[in-house]
């Protein structure tokens, strides 16, 4: 299984873009699933320039509704419409963003060709996404308006079966899944082989926290 866990910094300038930097946008690749974190103006242009898979993004997380963090979103959503996207898109953001986006489509007399699902964030410590590999939890930021960071936690991978043990104990295929989950091997003669003799520890789990505009507080350290 792929162990991809990579962040692409698409923009990092504060408040306004500069001649060299765009405002806040990041793309996280985890096991070839792509998560967009904030979407400032120029985001889709930068993604094209960086040859990032813009159409593979299915989940967008917006920290707050100051323009330098979301003003590129409407353009990206319209581009998805024009490019014929049909796959559902999930958008996580504080209250208010759905109204803004729906207004943009309404006044231009467009209806998106793909489903958009808005998930409104009200508080920190809220798990907003989970799949077989990762969870995403909100973090309340200290800012003038409702603002949230997002903590991506990788789930613990299954244990790795040792090739020598697989051959030595002639492990049946139907027991491999249980052994990778940490269970011991029970042989036909009743012998119990401890799991630690059969497997190796998996790689350590990783995490990534996207914390945007905020005042300092020690609660973020954990």
Question: What are the functions of these language-model segments?
Answer:
Residues 12-13, 65, 96, 165, ...:
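Active-site metal-binding loops of divalent metal-dependent hydrolases
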Residues 2, 52-55, 114, 132-134:
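Structured loop/turn residues at beta-strand edges in well-structured enzyme cores
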Residues 122-222:
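Metal-dependent phosphodiesterase/nuclease catalytic metal-binding core
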Residues 2-50, 86-88, 150-152, 159, ...:
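Conserved beta-strand hairpin/beta-sheet module of binuclear metal-dependent hydrolase folds
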Residues 109-121:
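A glycine-rich helix N-cap at a beta->alpha junction
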Residues 82-85, 108-112:
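Short helix-capping segments at alpha-helix termini
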Residues 7, 116-118, 136:
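Generic structural signal for residues in well-ordered beta-strands
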